[in-house]
Amino acid sequence: MKKVLVVGSARESFGGVSSTIKLMEQMPVWKEHTCYWLGTQIQRNYLWKLWYAMKSCFMAFFIIWRYDIVHFHTVPDRICLIIQMPIFLLAMLGKKKIIMHIHMGNQLRNHTANKLFLWHLRHADLIVLLAKKWQKLFLESYSNIKTPTTVLYNSCAMTPHSDYANRKNTILMMAYFNDNKAPDLLLKAWQTLQSRYPDWHIYMLGNGEVERFRQMSIDMGLQDSVTFTGYVTGKQKEEYFHNASILCMCSYEEGFPMVVLEAWTYGIPVVTTPVGGLPDVIEEGRNCVTFPFGDADALADKLAALIDNEQQRSDMSAYSQEFVRNHFSPEKINQDLRNIYARF
């Protein structure tokens, strides 16, 4: 069985890439291929990032020779590509099979002139996209790249079923808060709804520009019905998800959003933009409710309709858990990843 070196964000990092690798680490395919996770980027200060990148390159020089496949989890960001490039060159020198697993969606169209990205794509043996939608976009936008492509959806760990009737009147948003994640849309929508639903509360889970959006919520008079918790993990995160009645996502750009998969595993009805790879799997009114990008009024209407219809929320909860189990379970993605490695 060919051995695989997995290169990507550090274990200690936040976000979808490290979450994806952590889930892969729990799959049988990880042991079957004697996989090793080499972290290259970490979310710390610049000196710490530099030291971490240098350490990973130093380690790669000594360990890469024992592996047959190097599986890069990456984005077209110049800094990310530069950090991973020494390891990429070592993989080429050692004649290793190279997989470029691109954690990006509609942003791909912004990188067609990125020479560094194009160079990496041409020298890879396989390009992995997060959804069929992004594979189609890639083939259209990068028609001069002849490297084969395939699709691997993100996986999500299953959680025990919980009775939706026991949920609290809470709405979650979980993100690295910035303009792309658009938490202001949820705040604007809630500003029109809070007086109608005084017994409902919004919890904003995550880091990023927290103080900016917290102040925005105060300026809107939402401080009594909106709470910014900061970044949460473990039991605390589980408690929020087990209790939530709705999860909202307002993003403009995503690859394939992990937070939606997580919500489905907990049986949380999702209200979202049709962002990233979600159009591949959206069943409107069954596993999610969608609203147009940037439209706070439409979001308010969708939230109100869902809050008012407890039966629909209960039905969506049950169906979402069944749906994610059938399409995104670790068992399903484990076999898909096994098939990818078997190509070599």
What are these regions (language model features)?
Residues 5-6, 163-194, 203-205:
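Conserved donor-binding/catalytic core segment of Leloir-type glycosyltransferases
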Residues 122-161:
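Donor nucleotide-sugar binding/catalytic pocket of nucleotide-sugar-dependent glycosyltransferases
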Residues 214-232:
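Nucleotide-activated donor-binding/catalytic signature segment of Leloir-type glycosyltransferases, i.e.
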Residues 231-232, 239-244:
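Short alpha-helical donor nucleotide-sugar binding micro-motif in glycosyltransferases
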Residues 252:
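Aromatic "clamp/platform" in nucleotide-sugar-dependent glycosyltransferases that forms part
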Residues 269-272:
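Short hydrophobic beta-strand element within catalytic cores of glycosyltransferases
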Residues 284-285, 289-296, 305-310:
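Conserved acidic donor-binding segment of nucleotide-sugar-dependent glycosyltransferases
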Residues 298, 305, 312-326, 333-339:
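A short, well-ordered alpha-helix in the C-terminal region of glycosyltransferases
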